[in-house]
Amino acid sequence: MNVADAMTPREEVVTVSIPGTREDALEYLQGGAFSSVPVVKDGEDGEEFRGLVTREALIERPDEDQLALLVEEVPTVTSEASLADVARLVRESGHNRVPVVDNDHLAGIVTVTDVIRALANGEIAGTDVEVGPLSTHAVNTVYRETPLPVVQAELDYADVPYAAVLDDEGEPEGMLTEVDIIEVARVEEGEAETGESLADEDDDWKWEGIKATGNRYLPTRNVEIPAEPAHRFMSEDLVTVTRKRTAQDAAQLMISNDIEQLPLMTADDMVGILRDIDLLAAVIEDE
């Protein structure tokens, strides 16, 4: 199955244009439907593809307003490439949305979800591969009462887009993703006081601040994340999978529930996590 058969064609792809500002991309990324947005620019031969703006770029660089400075150059594929080629590229690059570019022009977007959907429908190789060996046994977790800004920091440090939420007994009770966080994040303008302004000494979640060096105010522009507990934003209905289930079974669960990861369970114990990018290994090895 080729990329052209699975991709979203250019006429249906949401893009932003240079010149522009971060708000142009934020209105699409904040809705949670996309993890990145293609950036185009008018050229001598028509519209030219310039790169992607990602959620991560907006969060990591909150003071950058110029769209051109937020653009990342990313690997691309042609419309004639196979979905196995896409699976391999995603595994190597870590980009979930791959621009389809023919002769410097954006022809469409192909995503991890497109490959997973083809796997769920039995349209590509890898359907009968068992998911146990594909899963990751290290699971990123957070406590249910962890403030959401701290959860965001933990996702950044762990370099994963999810966290399983644990209850007071240490049992998984939900899943929280970067999509859940970006949906409630807001860009705030204002003034920040530096120097003597440190966290409350009685704050249970105090993070060590910079040593006080005097008071001054600086104009700031930050991504504000509600300081509320993780459990208020998590998905409570955990959809799980066992080691012996096939890649096609897991793909069908992901597509039907619109999720990107499945806790791997043995009896009542969570022993790993199966992410959509893990399933791509089935497509590659069974090609």
Where are the predicted features?
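Tandem CBS (Cystathionine beta-synthase) repeat/Bateman regulatory domains
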Residues: M1-E287
